[in-house]
From Swiss-Prot:
Protein localization: Cell inner membrane
HAMAP family registered for this protein in UniProt: MurG
Entry's family note: Belongs to the glycosyltransferase 28 family. MurG subfamily.
UniProt name for this protein: UDP-N-acetylglucosamine--N-acetylmuramyl-(pentapeptide) pyrophosphoryl-undecaprenol N-acetylglucosamine transferase
Gene (UniProt): murG
Keywords associated with the record: Cell cycle, Cell division, Cell inner membrane, Cell membrane, Cell shape, Cell wall biogenesis/degradation, Glycosyltransferase, Membrane, Peptidoglycan synthesis, Transferase
């Protein structure tokens, strides 16, 4: 049986694409194990069916004083921990899907001379992947032109969940749809307070509440407050702290209001749905803005910076879309044209090149 070690952690934007690949690999009877970080989100999201190895490492950026001085020692410790795991498992290939666990994991792959493939989900590569690119056999990218083109760079698209890839096309879902404008609000798996607040402000002053229906993922922190506020403003609303059925949510929606993490952008393209992106302003290298541009330039999305975002802007867009379903459908179809439904298979195809004969 062939063996692959997947390295991914930290955020859903790294973990969910890796899970999509891992599940397909398991269907192909590959022995898949996972390398993550102690205390990371991967401890909650990676199913028990995938053996999960955890090392100790924290993000490097923003450290000062003693913490900065200790980082080299902590990196060495993490690399040694990853090294032991790799030597024990003996994978044919290591697939790095991002998160700060990828740094020590990738270095350990290089030390053990295990083939390393990295995948960059964002349109602007992170520091870790820029370093690991020099050691990797292949550099896979979710968006075109993330890395300078050379023989090692392959645009695979970003892997998304199978149930999203298999959803009906926009014209099937949306062409005959009537009734209120259905707005899906997402702030990432942790929620986004500024989006939550601006949405409430916009909807509370919306003149015709019967024209709007909302499904709002708030994050745990704001859940109770947002739920009570929707009751006050008399808008038809479903409020969840976390949405596990994303296929159901995207299928329900006419319009998505969200951040512009790589996973969200590619899920929206895979499904084919109109969107308003509010990029996280503190994302490293402003990568969320560049992710969103991928859809905006194709006429599939609107971008509003958080700095300039007002409830008046949102209300104006909602009014326009509520009266113009043809535009919603056109944006959804434009998004779907950019989808890479075969992304999982493209990633696996590169891994297969290093399978050992067993």
């Amino acid at each position: 049986m062939n063996r692959i070690l997947i390295i991914a952690g930290g955020t859903g934007g790294h973990i969910f694409p890796a899970l999509a690949v891992a599940r397909e690999l398991r269907e192909q009877e590959v022995d898949v194990q996972w390398l993550g970080v102690k205390g990371g989100l991967e401890e909650k999201l990676v199913p028990d069916s995938f053996p999960l190895h955890l090392i100790q490492i924290k993000a490097f950026r923003g450290k000062r004083g003693l913490q900065q001085l200790l980082m080299p020692l902590r990196l060495v410790r993490a690399v040694f921990q990853a090294y032991r795991i790799i030597r024990q498992f003996k994978p044919d290939v290591i697939l790095g899907m991002g998160g700060y666990v990828a740094g020590p994991g990738g270095l350990a792959a290089w030390i053990t001379r295990t083939p390393l493939i990295i995948h960059e989900q964002n349109s602007i590569p992170g520091l870790t992947n820029r370093v690991l690119a020099k050691m990797a056999k292949f550099i896979l990218q979710g968006f075109p032109d993330t890395f300078p083109q050379n023989r090692k760079v392959i645009t695979t698209g970003n892997p998304v969940r199978t149930e999203l890839v298999k959803m009906p096309l926009p014209q099937v879902r949306l062409a005959a749809r009537r009734g209120p404008l259905r707005i899906l609000v997402l702030g990432g798996s942790q929620g986004a307070r500024s989006i939550n607040q601006k949405m409430l402000a916009a909807l509370s002053s919306y003149p015709r509440s019967e024209e709007i229906a909302v499904w709002h993922q708030t994050g745990q922190r704001d859940f109770e407050f947002i739920q009570k506020e929707y009751e006050k403003i008399k808008i038809e609303a479903k409020v969840d702290n976390f949405i596990s059925d994303m296929a159901g949510a995207y299928g329900w929606a006419d319009l998505v209001v969200c951040r512009a993490g790589a996973l969200t952008v590619c899920e929206i393209a895979s499904v084919g749905v109109a969107s308003i992106f509010i990029p996280y302003p503190h994302a490293v290298d402003n990568h969320q803005f560049h992710n969103a541009r991928f859809l905006e330039q194709a006429g599939a999305a609107i971008i509003i910076s958080e700095e300039s975002l007002t409830e008046t802007d949102l209300m104006r867009w909602f009014e326009q879309f509520a009266q113009d379903r043809d535009r919603l459908l056109t944006m959804a179809e434009n998004a779907r044209k950019l989808a890479k439904p075969e992304a999982v298979q493209r990633v696996i195809a590169q891994c297969k090149k290093f399978y050992a004969a067993r």
